[in-house]
Amino acid sequence: MAKKIQAIVKLQVSAGMANPSPPVGPALGQQGVNIMEFCKAFNAKTEPLEKGLPIPVVITVYADRSFTFETKTVPAAVLLLKAAGVKSGSPKPNTNKIGKVTKTQVREIAETKQADMTGTSIDANIQSILGTARSMGLEVEE
């Protein structure tokens, strides 16, 4: 018999830096989960990744207060900013361009994100990443 699911908690936690402070502590504490157990497991799983990158995580909490979690890939916006070498997006993306990314970089990001994206093909995912880049004020070079 499958365990009864009590809650599904979605968070963004920095890779290798999970600790009981907000947002992790309050979100899991409300569900009665052992917070330190999650932090240790999450930090161990994200150890190979670059420290500090925001990692979306989906935590399934069961009625017996046990849990499982699944990490997703880094958000596309973060990968685009990193590729362009800038800190944040443009407040006016239509008029102020803040940086440039190449089609090759966009393709690499789309391939990295392939598992988490809803597009059926790599080309559809590339178009999605291009839209994200445009909305952030990034120019895409050939």
From Swiss-Prot:
SMART domains in the cross-refs: RL11 (SM00649)
Free-text description of this protein's post-translational modifications in UniProt: One or more lysine residues are methylated.
Family annotation (InterPro entries): Ribosomal_uL11, Ribosomal_uL11_bac-typ, Ribosomal_uL11_C, Ribosomal_uL11_C_sf, Ribosomal_uL11_N, Ribosomal_uL11_N_sf
Record's keyword annotation contains tRNA-binding: no
Record flagged with keyword S-adenosyl-L-methionine: no
Alphabetized SUPFAM superfamilies for the sequence: Ribosomal L11/L12e N-terminal domain, Ribosomal protein L11, C-terminal domain
GO CC terms of this entry: cytosolic large ribosomal subunit
GO BP terms in the entry: translation
Subunit structure of this chain's protein: Part of the ribosomal stalk of the 50S ribosomal subunit. Interacts with L10 and the large rRNA to form the base of the stalk. L10 forms an elongated spine to which L12 dimers bind in a sequential fashion forming a multimeric L10(L12)X complex.
Family membership: Belongs to the universal ribosomal protein uL11 family.
Protein name (database record): Large ribosomal subunit protein uL11
Protein species of origin: Hamiltonella defensa subsp. Acyrthosiphon pisum (strain 5AT)
